[in-house]
Amino acid sequence: HRDLHSFPTRRSSDLDYYVDNAEEMKGKWGEAFADNSRPLYLELGCGKGGFAAQHALKYPDINIIAADIKADMLAVGRRTVENMFAAVGRTHDNIILLRINIVNISQLFAENDKVDRIYINFCNPWNRGKHNKRRLTHPRQLEQYKNILKTGGELRFKTDDDELFEDSVEYFKECGWEITYITRDLHSEDFPDNLVTEHERMFAEEGKKIKYLSALPPVKSK
């Protein structure tokens, strides 16, 4: 992939959109997109990229970074993005695939990089006790997310796993986040902003209820 030091302010259609040198992008994330005046969203644990690709196509006026630690997943994600965009004749100029360890996510964004929204969709539940701290909704992660969200920015969390969801609700409360919307059966509600991926459809067809919440981080004291 191309060295991102060479990213122009506006991205040409042939420029690579896969990033694995995230540390070098701190303070320069806007430069990775064709139009850095758009809102910036971040999906954590993007897997095969289906959600992020759908989002980028449906909302061309929003930039989205789709992050995962697994290179093999992101390789599938690249094909997903390319195929979905090619099918409608669009250039993928509002999506970046990012390979990172999300444990250190807050170290990769500067003040001018803050994001408007974070998505966490169907992440590994890590339900065995000693592994709970690996959860993307664990309090130590929520502490980082509040530092990279803009004022008024929100986090949206979706899962099919009951234990992860109930524990996460407690995590958000413990960390002072305000839960603004919550449902334990998303598909039974009229929620127009929901993008349904193949993953989510599969769970629903198996009879699993999809749990969802939106939350705002605690207001920082001045």
Where are the predicted features?
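Conserved beta-strand signature within the Rossmann-like core of class I S-adenosyl-L-methionine
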Residues: G152-T159
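A short glycine-rich, Lys/Arg-flanked "PGG" loop and its adjoining helix->strand segment in the class I
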Residues: T137-T151
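Conserved SAM/SAH-binding beta-strand->alpha-helix loop
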Residues: K70
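Class I SAM-dependent methyltransferase "Motif I" SAM/SAH-binding loop
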Residues: G45-G49
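Short, small-residue-biased leader/transition segments that mark boundaries at the very start
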Residues: H1-S12
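Class I S-adenosyl-L-methionine
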Residues: E170, C175-K222
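S-adenosyl-L-methionine
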Residues: R79-N112
